[in-house]
């Protein structure tokens, strides 16, 4: 019984140890090779979340349209590209859709939003490392130092979209 309790406590601590909270820099994650990476095959690292304000859309392909109003609102803001970067990370392990179909759709999105960095996560790396909601659409914003300044798991309301825009403006 004592061993079981120790095991359960260890599992709980390991599961919560990497959750990112507001005002914190998330633990480093790197998506490369079998774990994922950019559309062009190059690796992506969370170390890149510095120097500019970044917004990450971490999305299950089945929820791809959930936060379109937020991405469209950000696009309309025309934030300067030397101070702002959007990143779309696709949780490919969260869907039954074949990767080739998703990759085709991502290439179309890349053409529509050329300033956005598109990244594939084949193994739910961010779900595990940052405790992001799985099978969902998540929006996270980071300041120039890589500190989390906004987080929403699920659909953003109109008020939350305005809050996101305000937080970005305040940190540019």
Language-model regions: role of each:
Residues 135-172:
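Thiol-/selenol-based redox modules, centered on thioredoxin-like
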Residues 3-13:
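Sec-dependent N-terminal signal peptides
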Residues 30-53:
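A short beta-strand-turn-helix
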Residues 52-54, 62-109:
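Structural microenvironment flanking redox-active thiols in thiol-disulfide oxidoreductases
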Residues 61-65, 92-96, 123-126, 148, ...:
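Solvent-exposed loop/turn segments at secondary-structure junctions
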Residues 87-89, 104-135:
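Short, internal strand/loop/helix patches
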């Amino acid at each position: 019984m004592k061993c079981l309790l120790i095991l359960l406590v260890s599992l709980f601590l390991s599961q919560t140890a990497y959750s990112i909270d507001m005002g914190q820099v998330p633990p480093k994650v790197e998506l490369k090779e079998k774990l994922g990476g950019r559309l062009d095959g190059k690796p992506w690292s969370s170390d890149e979340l510095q120097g500019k304000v970044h917004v990450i859309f971490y999305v299950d392909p089945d929820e791809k349209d959930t936060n379109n109003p937020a991405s469209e609102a950000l696009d309309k803001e025309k934030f300067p590209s030397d101070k702002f970067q959007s990143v779309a990370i696709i949780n490919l392990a969260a869907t039954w859709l074949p990767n080739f179909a998703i990759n085709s759709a991502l290439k179309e999105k890349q053409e529509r939003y050329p300033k956005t960095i598109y990244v594939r996560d084949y193994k739910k790396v961010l779900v595990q490392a940052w405790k992001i909601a799985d099978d969902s659409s998540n929006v996270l914003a980071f300041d120039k130092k890589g500190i989390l300044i906004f987080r929403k798991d699920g659909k953003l309301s109109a008020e939350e979209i305005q809050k996101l825009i305000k937080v970005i403006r305040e940190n540019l």
